[in-house]
Amino acid sequence: MFRRACLAAIAVCALGLTTAAHAQGYKEKVKEFRIGLLGGENTQDRLARYGKFQQLLQEKLGIPVKLFPAADYAGVMQGIAAGQLEMASFGASGFAGAWLDCKCIEPIAVPQENDGSTYYYSVLVVRADSGIKSIEDMKGHSLAWADPNSTSGYLIPSATLKAKGIKLDDGAYFSKTGFSGGHEQGVVAVLNKQYDGAVTWTSGQGDAAEGYSRGNLRSMVDKKMLKMSDIRVIWQSGKIPNGPWAIRTALPDDLKKVVTQFLLDLPKSHKDVYDDVERGSGIGYAPATMELYHDIIELRTAEQRANRS
């Protein structure tokens, strides 16, 4: 009987050690967790928005968490593909492009708007005093895209305009087009009369006078860079799936589970941090699936074919 008790105790201890080792397993393989921050906002503001997020995730993982702000969307996409970043919050098009490039990432969480939806909108904005009130009025005027890998800042509006028969070459319809370097920069260029119009993103929900509930316009209003009375929205897209938090597929499963649960819990445990990261309000994150981005991946694939032809 004593022997059976000893064997039972040894078994329990062994199970405990195995469980503990499994729980800490990813720490032996992953010494630091690197997060890529998309361009489109000045570096200081990006690092400030993610500072508390970085600290909380580091406490949860028990390994160093580092932030890497990229100059543009492509920098984050390339960092993920090269294994130099573990995770990033992508736009839908950026995620689709990164997935098409390396097939090495998977979506884990997607922001939900205040009504529980997981969609947002692309909008075209002009100065309120410009006299421009429609896409038709934009003929002969200049248009700023945000970034070639932005969903709302390029992919969707350019595809929509092409579907209307509008040619995007300089002088064909618009006097000129160009990439501003990001959403924030595009709106600033309009305010400074460097471009007549710019495309950016918004939740399309909430008080329009405050820049809506979430998005670039809301962020700029909150930072006192913009008064909504100074601009006019002349076009809005159809629904676009919110971009996901995506993580490298090759990472240990236990690490991916901890990070995913951290994101899902964040709005309840630290709503202020969630609002900082997502640039406005929302009810939280939902689990993300590849299915949500199927149409965007198809659109990116078609764009790549067209560019090669």
Regions found by a protein language model. Name each.
Residues 2-8:
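N-terminal export leaders
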Residues 69-73, 83-102, 110-111, 183, ...:
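Beta->alpha turn/N-cap motifs
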